[in-house]
């Protein structure tokens, strides 16, 4: 019995030791736990960081603060993102990708005490411009290093090349990383075990070395400033699966004409925005494993290259922004094709019959080409289609019912064609963007569009859509852009159209037949940037709740029947750049304000065709800070920017150079003040001369008096000045002749007197610029100044100069000439015959004849 107890006791001790020995290594070393906690405390957790982060495969992973689970009471081996060696307990891997970390990454970080690390992933955090420490090169056992998209900046240290065991190196970022050009090749030379190399957006600014690791499966060098000819050896890396050289505009790529060593392995090839030498060779036909090909913006021309049609396993083909032409061939061989983009090739033509042969398509973009005819109505195999873009072609006919029946449709863009008929009910419940603008569609807005839960873009402008705007539109709580302008909609604007939507940025209901008051409540916290309601029959007052639109850049309520005084409070909208209240029934004086922060960013102010009275609003004019500067930082024209310019161009009526224009895009330099057709009185404030960026000034058809301010000479970029039909008196300031950009001038029907300035632009204006001013004189008017010939027109001055240069000879000169000629002539004859030198006379005669002939030719040239 005692022996049995002894055996059980020894077995118990053995098992206890066994369990203890197997669990002890999992206890994190205290110094490493402390190092991790110190590392954690160097950063804050930003809960406003992106909720999702893309990983290297393009998939999205959810962000969350992994370090919140770290505390002293538990072993660090159990902490989120920390992995320990099962035998020794040493920390060998740290995965903190997408962990919402924010703060400076110091070069002496406690992280570098974890000397046994084999895998380190710090991607998708925010280290706010920290430098990459050379100490990363001390992790001698590291096989995986990912620092991408974490806002590192500066030069990538050469010590990274010491990590000779690296299999994966990912340091791509758009924050401003670079590698010293002569360090790139040595870096590759030492990293002979690399499988994946991603340096996207890192500034390399060098030629492409040829000493890449022969084990490479992934090489991503997009946007790195590579130049020169790509070594052909890159295409012969036998294990290569993914090659991305996109956005290197100085890189030349010449594809091998013979079979590539990588032809069996290569699955993704991206060469967007590089220079492709020669045509696509037949060797492309051997890329049997290729699934994705991006050759956009590579200057391909002619028909779609035939070798591409042999890529039977292709799933994504992107040939956008090229110069391809001719019809699109049938696609029955592309059985696996899911994404096809031929966007903006311009000269691709023919019909869409080829669509009948593909059943796997999920995304099709044929926009901005020359495709013609109707969309085939007998297509039934595109049930997987999610995105269809056919905008900016020459397509016509009705939109076939199969498009409205697509069960998984997410985005539809058929804009800028001539489609007719009605918009049918949509079957899909997943729509996020519907763009049918600029067609000939009619009928009502279908209810199925107004019941979408994820709709962000609804652009139906420039059609013949009729009926009322249903209150069901208020169900679109995710809407960002709503453009129903230039249709035949009538009735009132639903009050809830803005109230229930916190994402709405653009609201355009312009050029319809909407009536009633603007009873919409613009709620606090809205993000509206554009409100365009012009060209309707809206009445009542300007809604005071507009004061809640803190991000508003454009407000166009023109061409309505609003009856109100000037809404001076709109000046508190600090982002407002364009304000049009033209053609309403606004009235009364524009009261001055002591607040110098009103309308400071305004670039276009149109209050024309109203009933405003009193003096011009000098205090507001003095606040227009955006007009007090001329931006000479760029020579290329820039338009007032908007994050949704690609989808939407606002339509605003502006008056410049004597004409009204419906402008869809407005130059950032276009500064306009239009206060015409009102009842303003008093003098023109000289403070307008401070608005040196002004391009158009129209104060016509008011009751203004006094003189034209001499300060207008400061308006050096002014292109159009209209002060007509007022009671302005005095002379035209001579200093205005210095306005070299002035193209249109209208000072007619005033009480101006004196001489019209001469020179430069003033010599190009006609009588109509000055008519109705009986006291004016000088060119181009027939009335001369001063009552004598002292003042003449430029043409008369030229004639006088010509007459001064002509050889006019008075009668006294004629007599003197004859007398002198007679004496000299007789003397010459006497000398000639007395000296017997006729040869000498002959030579002298020839010489004189030559001189006279030359001078006569010069004289003729002057005329």
Curated annotation (Swiss-Prot):
Q: Which UniProt keywords apply?
A: Cell membrane, Glycoprotein, Leucine-rich repeat, Membrane, Plant defense, Repeat, Signal, Transmembrane, Transmembrane helix
Q: How does it sit in the membrane?
A: Single-pass type I membrane protein
Which Gene Ontology cellular component terms are annotated?
Answer: plasma membrane
Keyword Cell membrane in the entry? The reply is yes
Spans of repeat LRR? 91-114, 115-138, 140-163, 164-190, 191-213, 214-237, 240-262, 264-286, 287-311, 312-336, 337-357, 358-382, 383-406, 408-428, 429-452, 454-476, 477-500, 502-524, 525-549, 551-572, 573-597, 599-623, 667-690, 691-714, 715-739, 741-759
Residues making up the signal peptide according to the UniProt record: 1-21
The positions flagged as glycosylation sites are 71, 108, 190, 203, 211, 261, 299, 310, 378, 396, 416, 464, 519, 563, 674, 698, 714, 746, 767
Q: Which residues cross the membrane?
A: 813-833
The segments annotated as topological domain Extracellular are 22-812
Q: Name one GO biological process term.
A: defense response to fungus
Q: Which family does it belong to?
A: Belongs to the RLP family.
Q: What is said about the domains?
A: The extracellular leucine-rich repeats are required for the specificity of the elicitor protein recognition.
Q: Which PANTHER family match?
A: LEUCINE-RICH REPEAT RECEPTOR PROTEIN KINASE EMS1-LIKE-RELATED, LEUCINE-RICH REPEAT-CONTAINING N-TERMINAL PLANT-TYPE DOMAIN-CONTAINING PROTEIN
- Name under which the protein is recorded: Receptor-like protein 9DC3
Its gene name is: 9DC3
